């Protein structure tokens, strides 16, 4: 029976990693927010890898924290191991990665949502949207409840018409055998949304007590305290190790002999899988010359014996999975606890979204996470916080917020999705960012905390600490520009020990720091500051001085980009009225409807000649517009 369930500012459908960030951002901004999710016990569930972070992804987690989101704080409370990756490389590619206690992670995030002001949690299944005259007004659940709102955010993950596949077995299911969402998917098609079919997979889990760890290599966490959140002060010290082993030629032989049983190769799986997280079958076929592949054994938590066999993602039949495990050193007698599987699901074509993550087809409707064609918890959470901010701002009559490609990896992610689209589950990589020297792990707060404070997601106390840090960085940089280090015996000894050439004359401390072999610690010994310099301040001072030339070059490129971003294109421009555009360019421009010349220039199929024609047309001022029928 239909009934009125309530009225809110914002409704969030789904409480995975995107939904949690969207709901918390919306509620913290001051919007009365409702979260409807299929199962309250599965909030922030990790159906695949029990980890947060990694290259590019770890920087997204820092950006979420700098804006005032929750993922960083939650993993800092619940990790079992933390490691900084790429420490031997430059600062642009360093990233933090944490193994999560997946059950504790869920529990802590649920507690955070339950205790959040302005936020209501509800278990239920949304089957339809309330859409009137192209505007989303609310949602309808399977019990007939009508909930009304000024904005709705859909964050349904891999649940839309989800199907699990193991060998020749295929059945309707969400991840980890949860119930799927079928009617909502059908309803989105009814509304006119173009959907695509994607696929992802997960490896088997085995019982830790049955692993022979003596045949594997230990992978401990970092001894140095690390954290994702800028606010974390307590660190977990009793970390659990992960373990490294490898597939063997026997593993590969079994896979080759049973490829006909793999749903990927039998034709049972139609969806496109993630390029950068291939199944073991895919790896063996594509890299046939490799004698072995890495397998990481990752504990799923402190209170469980389940171990995630990372690198062995597969949808081969269960009995073949058991045979594969027997060929891997350390896993010969491992007990299978959960079989690996593939899951196919619906996603919307993301070029149907504006950069705010509002849909072009239905006003006041936003989407975030894997429904937009991405893979990964971090990519989902990054979209979630932006969709939550923009939905709340729409409900409260405030300005929309769009992060540019030079602001954040989140900006790169969203721009790639809405401008270029994706024909496979999209994964964020450092190589996707043109300005990666500016978008570092260490400076996410300097890039985004000002914005988080202006929006209302950063507290006054945190903002004042941030300002104090900024001032300390500038003070110390200024000091190092003026202090002269003379070639005394002590100075020459420190430089020699660092592997550098001795000084002939006095040198400014900043210039000495620019030498590749010198660190801030060396400078601290030779020219100590009068005040205590915090490690995070010292880190910024060293990076900003050492890489100043490269950073300035990147900033000049950003300025050029901003000029193109400032050349706006009306949403309703009639591209059919512009003479001279190539047919493909006209089609792509009509589909994406870019909001600036910069965005238009990034669309595949739009070449520089088309951009020149578009610029001339805009500058002449008489712009034809499409009618809003």
From Swiss-Prot:
It is found in: Cytoplasm. GO terms for molecular function: flavin adenine dinucleotide binding. GO terms for biological process: tRNA methylation; tRNA wobble uridine modification. FAD binds at residues 14-19, 126, 181, 370. One of its GO terms (cellular component) is cytosol. Pfam families: GIDA, GIDA_C_1st, SAM_GIDA_C. Its cofactor is FAD. NAD(+) binds at residues 273-287. Homodimer. Heterotetramer of two MnmE and two MnmG subunits. PANTHER family: GLUCOSE INHIBITED DIVISION PROTEIN A, PROTEIN MTO1 HOMOLOG, MITOCHONDRIAL. NAD-binding protein involved in the addition of a carboxymethylaminomethyl (cmnm) group at the wobble position (U34) of certain tRNAs, forming tRNA-cmnm(5)s(2)U34. This is tRNA uridine 5-carboxymethylaminomethyl modification enzyme MnmG. It comes from Geobacillus kaustophilus (strain HTA426).
